[in-house]
Each structure stands twice: as C-alpha cells, then as structure tokens.
Amino acid sequence: MTSSARNGSPSPSPALPSTTTPAEQESRNTMTTANNPGDWDSSESRPQPLSNGKGVGNGMVANGHQRPSTSSTAASANNASAKDPLRPRRKKAKRACFACQRAHLTCGDERPCQRCIKRGLQDTCHDGVRKKAKYLHDAPNEALIPGIRGNLYSQAQAARNKINTNSQQRNGTNSNSDNNSTNTNSNNKPSHQDVSTNFFSTPSTNNYNTVYTQAKSRQSQHMPSRVMQDATMNPSAFQAQPPASPTFDLSSNPQNHTLSPSMAQNSGTTPSSSASQNPDPYGPTFFDPSHPALFNFDIASMNFGNRYGALEFGMLGHLATGAGDTPPSDSATRRGSIGRSSGTFTVQNFGEGSSNQSPFLFGGDPVLNDWNPAGQGQTNSRNIYNQNSVSGQMADHPHAFAIESAPMNFASPSSTESPQMTTVTQFDDPSVNFSSRTTLMPPTNTQHQQQPQPPRISTPSLKNMQVGVKRRYRSPSSIYESVKEPYSYTSGFHSLTAFIQRRFSPQKTLQIAKALASIRPSFIATTKTLNQDDLIFMEKCFQRTLWEYEDFIDACGTPTIVCRRTGEIAAVGKEFSILTGWKKEVLLGKEPNLNVNTGGSSSSGVSSRGSSTYNSRNSATMTVMDNQSLPTGRTQPVFLAELLDDDSVIEFYEDFAKLAFGDSRGSVMTTCKLLKYKTKEDGVGLFRNSNGEVSAAGGGGTAADDTDANDGAGAGAGDGTTSAVNGVSNGSGNNATNVNANGNVNVIPNDLSGASSMKLSPKQAWGKSRIAGEAGMNQLGFRDGKVECSYCWTVKRDVFDIPMLIVMNFLPCI
C-alpha cells in the first residue's frame, strides 16, 4: 500500500519513472521554498524529509512524483498578490500585540491577531506596552489603558465570559440569546464571533447599563407621557460601538424601558436578570467617580492615545460645561445645559418629592419644549439646574450631558430665537408659582400625594436679566479701515517736554531729562528703519491692542489707565474717574482740561517752582507753546505727569527708563500720589451728594471743624480752608450755590442755609476708616488734593520691540 492509499486518497495512475536526479529535485524544492519566505512560520510549508531518506519536500511522494498541493497553490497566489504594486495597503493597528511588537511586524486590530493564530500563540496574544511619554511618567500604568476600541483582550477573560453565558443558558435566563455566539472549536481556540463579542463588551458596561435600566423601570410609572425623541441619544444609533456610559433609552412608551437590541446582544443579559442581580439601582458601584460612565465620557471618540489623557480632558470639559450643581442664575451661560426655558425659572423642575422625580435627569421633553419658536405653548419648564438639587432631592442622580455627549440640537439657536431668562412672574408671587406648578405636575396616586413636601428654597428676583454679552460699538475690522496715517509721537514728546519745563523746577526737570535721555538712543535705533507703512501698521497694532484692553478695563473693578509711550492717556476706567475726579472725556482730550491742582501748597495754580503757573489747555485750541509742535485741531490727551505729584513723576520716569527696553514681561509696583481734578471754580461751600445728604466741599485746602459764621451764601474765603456746616447762619433765605469738582452747579435750599446749627453725619466725615461706596471714594484726597495709592504698571511692546503702551492699576491706601 502506497502512502496515498494510507492517507485515504485514491492512488494515482501509474506513470513513467522519473528521470530527475535527487540533487536536481532538492535544488528545485529549495527554490520553491525561497519564493515563500512568509510561510516559514507555519509547519506545513517547511520542507520535511520523508522516511526514505531522500531530501524531497512535502509535495513529493516516495517514488519521486509530485502531487498537487492546495496550500502551495494558495501561498503562491498570496505571494503573487503581495508583489503587486497596486495591491491595497494593510491598515495598521492602533496598538500591536506583544509578539508582533517584539518582532517589529505589522499587526491587526483583532485579538488574537492572524499572525499569533498562525504561530499558535493565540492564548498569549495581548496588546503590547508602549513607552510612556514624558508628561505621563507620573501616571500609573493602570490609567494608561486604551479606549473602548482598544480594550485589552485576554483568553482568561474570554473564558470567564463564556462560562457566565453557559451558566445563564442552564438557568434558563437567556433562552432567547443566539447560540452561535458561544460556539468554540475543538482546540478551544476562539472563533471570530467570540473575538468580536469579547472585544466590545466589558463587565463594567454590562453592570452600568443594566443598573440604569432597572432604575428607569422602577420609576417609569411616574413619567410623563411625552418623552424626548433624539437620534443622537438613542442607543440604537451606536450599534457599531456600544457606549460604556449609562444609556438613556427614550422610547415612545414610558412603561417599557429596556435595553436596545444592540446593547442586549453585547451585554449578554436581559432586563429581568439585571433586576434580580442588582437590587440597589443607585448603589456605590453606579456612582463610582473614577468610572467614565458617570459623566457620559465617550473616550473612544476623543482621539486620545491613552485613557489617562482622555479622562483628564473629559473632566476639564465636564467642569467647563457646568454639568455640576450650578445655581439657576448661571445656568443659561453654560454650553450644553439642558432645559433652558424660554419662559421663567420654576422651583418645580423635577417634582416635589421622590414620587415625581423623573428617572431621566432632564425630565420629559425639555429639548422639544425649551427651544420651541415663539408663540407655541409650553407644558414643561423643567430645568437641570433646579432648586431641589440644593435641598438634596437630586443627590442620588448622575449629572447629565458632559463633553462630547450632548446632541447637536442643543447648540445655541439664532439670535432671533434665543431665549431670555426672566424671574419676574413666578418668583414675585408664590401663589402663582404654586398654581402653575400644580397644573404642570402629572397625576399621582394618593400615597405619594400624602408625603410631606420639602421646604421651598426661594431665589432672589433678578429683574429683567438678559442673556448675552454687551455688544461692542465697533469691530476690529473698523480699526484697520479707519487708521490711515501714523501717530505723531514726535509731537507728543515735544508737548511732554514743554509741560515738564512749565511745571517742574530746573533740578527736577534735569532728573526727568536724564531718564529720558538714557533710552533715546534705543528709540532712534529701533525706528530709523521704519517707513510710512510700518508706522501705519504700528498704529493699527496699538489700536487693536487697545480694543482688547477695553474689555479688560470694563471687567476689572480696579482703577486702571492705559497710556502711550509718550505718557498720553489712551484709555481709562470708570473707577479711576471716581477715585480722582478726572472725567474720561477730559483725560482723552475730548473736553477742555481746566485742572489747576498741580500738587503745590495751594490751589491757585502755583507750582513748586514758585514763579511759573500752569496754563490749562483746551483740546481744540492749543496754547501758544503747544501750537509750535502740534497741528491745528489735534486733540491733546492728558499726560500721565499731570496726574501725579512731583516726586511720583520723577520716580516713574526713572523706572520707565529701566523697563522700556529691559525685561519685556517685567513690572513695577510702588506707591504714588494721584492729583484730584480741581478747577478755579471749586470754591468752599456745600453740595448735595447722591444720597441726598449734605457734606462739605473745598478747594485744595484742608477741612476744618471750626465754628465759623457765614452769611448763608455757602462761599468760603478762598484761602484753602473749608467752613464747617455747624456754623451760625443769619437765615437770610438765599439759596447757597456751589460748583463741585465735576463742574456741576448744586443749589442748596434756603431751609438748609438758614439752619441755626448742623453737624456732619459720621458717614460724611473725612476719616479713612469710614470710606464706603462711590461717595466715599470721592472723599479721598479732599484735604490736600492728593490720593495716596499703591500702583502696579507694565510696558507692552509692539512687533518692532518698541514700547507701545503702558498699563497701570491703582489701589488707594485707606
């Protein structure tokens, strides 16, 4: 009996004896094997000698004849296609297995991979370990597990899943499941069906979804009939990849809340079995904060290479979207918040008590109701940011949508359909709130109605609170269109020099000149190569940067000013005007500057030099000295040196010389004295403040508590002293007049001027310990016309590395 007969195959027909020598046949087998280098891993394609001692291959019988081999033909076809340059490229796996990683071979996404199956290593085929990045050295190895699509596969885990499935079949709990998913071959090697099932399903996914399914089935009887229909939130839309987060399966029938077919197939359980296995739907396992399912993180769609970075990014997004316990007043400003009602905020968002709590955190159908166009009736005004969450009603519920899990229809609508929050109707009248709440509540049984109602938490009424940000008066595009000429810094420096010579003594002028002379060569070196277009571009950069600082000044409650490198004021905050009395229009040069307070010994305008006086300048008509350097009609803003006393100005320019071309991110923090805005008409008298109370006002002198006699006209002697209100009046009946620091004329009725005796209230005293409100800020520096402050300033440079603007923040010393 030949070898063919022993193998059970028909004997080949007799043929002529072969004339091929053994040496030629061995050489031919060697060439055939060399053409198939990829088959060396398989024992079938490796040449094996037969018992006759001749070096013939597997495809040769004992008599030297060659029989056809199916495996050799398939291998030849594969090798032919592998050499084809037009063959489709193999898609690389996201993470190679350990064996392929060690061999530096291309692996696949399936586990076990085809190469390990061919080599018989399917039992030990698992994902390889990558080298940690530098920023992940401190992360534990357990946190670097790949996402859902890259779950680690192990044969032991697959065996445990099959044992659980077989036990459920024996108990009769899973009679409707597909038996083909549990079939294995005789060698205990997993089939492709087992690989796909074990790859996508994890024990945590099964546990979390079944737990939440039971929670929905327990409370489904208290659900409203209308529920939200959204394809992006339906688990059936994710059949290709079941999510690991708790699935909100919103079907049309609230009484039938079960898992979707895809989830039931992947989890391998039914709702009935999950209800018996998980008696506590809200146990500690469901609210494990370390599990991404609690926050609905879809880690696989975040395009992160590791789980550690995806969780960190997801938690930051969860905090940014405000999915936590956010007050109702802030909920409308959060991206992706659920249930922003276009009507009003109501206390009854999820119902009073556990009987009316919806199993879905966002109620019945807030999306369909809250974003309805105007004119349609709304029957549900529930909101995720509710008052009951404060009292602990929703403490056992998970937070709703976080990052990358909110449907696309939650995006902000157009401005015409944007809702506006008002809290006028229901918060003002509790009875209206209660009546509207009872009409919106679904009917419940008597047992739940007899439960005690928790106390209502009232929210202060916010009148006419509008949603949105204050619109700008201009856009950045207008800056590039309006700037046509460069700014004349040469004229600005000439005006600054003329002002310093008029105000300061020769010794102080020399100190300031030395400081400016130290940075003059640097200015010349950086500007000598600039042409007209560069100077225009420089001014556009300045205006664009100033446009950004306007929002900063409005949002910051600190007195702030922004000036050019010449010291000319370019922007000012409202708080600075309150503190110093300088109006914004005066500082920017839009109104005449009538200030006579230069920090001297009196308010007559005499400076520390003693001989020269400071001439107030008009923004439209320059003085004779300024006309020599400024073009006609150019507005002249106030210089920074006009706002500080002499010592503060000298100290500022000495620091500016060090910081202008020094540290680009450096800053200076020191103390100074700001000068109050005072005119010649700011005499001694009385004025009525915003609270209707009477207080004293004086020029640059000091306020005295002496008892002086006046004639009721309200005017002082002009010598820098202020007459107190408790003086004796003759009761002439004439109204007292006074021009305050802002130029407004205040008239005091004759009943006050004719009073025999009045004293200042404690709130109107000039003591620093009694400063409160805007009126208290105005009182600072009224004795000597100076406000002692601590201030911090820095220099911002442009693209040419030239000092562009100076930003200064002040805080009064009280």
Swiss-Prot record:
Residues 189-208, 248-279, 339-359, 375-384 have a biased composition (Polar residues). CDD domains: GAL4 (cd00067). SUPFAM superfamilies: Zn2/Cys6 DNA-binding domain. It is found in: Nucleus. Residues 69-83, 171-188, 442-451, 720-739 have a biased composition (Low complexity). Residues 1-90, 164-208, 236-287, 323-384, 442-461, 598-617, 695-739 are annotated as: Disordered. Keywords: Activator, DNA-binding, Gluconeogenesis, Metal-binding, Nucleus, Transcription, Transcription regulation, Zinc. Residues 97-125 bind DNA. Pfam families: PAS_13. PANTHER family: TRANSCRIPTION ACTIVATOR OF GLUCONEOGENESIS ERT1, ZN(II)2CYS6 TRANSCRIPTION FACTOR (EUROFUNG)-RELATED. Belongs to the ERT1/acuK family. This is Transcription activator of gluconeogenesis PADG_03802.
